[in-house]
C-alpha cells in the first residue's frame, strides 16, 4: 500500500471512487445523480489542488484533496472505495492530510463533513465548530463543519 501525488490522468478513476463512496451511505439514486457533478473531477481540478492517492497493487482505492481557505487547510475530498471502508484506509489518508497540512504551515485543518462521516472524523480528533445549512429537493440538510488543531 502506498500514497502518491495525484496525476492529471487520475481524474476519471477518482471520480468513480468519490461517487462509489458517497453511494455507500445509501442515498437515493436520484440524489446521487444530483450530486454527480460535484463528484466528477477534471484533470484541471488536480492541477489546482493538493491531492494524494492511496493505492493497493498500483490501483487507486482512495484519495484526498486539500485546499487553502482563509489561511487554514481544508479537506475538500476524502473518499475510500466501499470495499475498503473500515480497514484503516481513511485513517491513513486523514493522517497523511494532517502531515501535509503541517508541512504547508497550517495550524488548523477543517472540513465540511457528510453527516454519515462525523463519527469517523471525531475518532480522528476533530470536533464540530459550526454547521452549514443545505438542502436537496427541498429537504433541509445540516452539514457539520469540523476542525482539528495541528
PLM region spans:
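Conserved beta-hairpin
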Residues: 50-62
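Conserved catalytic-core motifs of GNAT/GCN5-like acyltransferases
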Residues: 110-112, 127-145
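Conserved GNAT acetyl-CoA-binding A-motif
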Residues: 101-113
Amino acid at each position: 500500500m502506498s500514497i502518491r501525488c495525484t496525476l492529471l490522468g487520475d481524474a476519471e478513476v477518482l471520480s468513480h471512487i468519490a461517487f462509489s463512496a458517497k453511494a455507500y451511505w445509501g442515498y437515493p439514486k436520484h440524489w446521487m445523480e444530483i450530486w454527480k457533478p460535484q463528484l466528477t473531477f477534471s484533470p484541471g481540478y488536480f492541477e489546482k489542488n493538493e491531492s494524494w492517492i492511496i493505492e493497493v497493487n498500483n490501483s487507486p482505492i482512495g484519495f484526498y484533496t486539500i485546499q487553502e481557505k482563509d489561511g487554514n487547510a481544508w479537506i475538500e475530498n476524502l473518499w475510500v472505495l466501499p470495499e475498503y471502508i473500515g480497514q484503516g484506509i481513511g485513517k491513513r489518508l486523514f493522517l497523511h492530510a494532517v502531515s501535509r497540512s503541517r508541512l504547508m504551515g497550517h495550524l488548523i485543518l477543517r472540513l465540511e463533513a457528510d453527516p454519515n462521516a462525523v463519527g469517523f472524523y471525531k475518532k480522528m480528533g476533530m470536533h464540530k465548530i459550526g454547521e452549514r445549512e443545505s438542502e436537496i429537493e427541498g429537504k433541509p440538510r445540516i452539514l457539520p463543519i469540523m476542525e482539528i488543531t495541528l
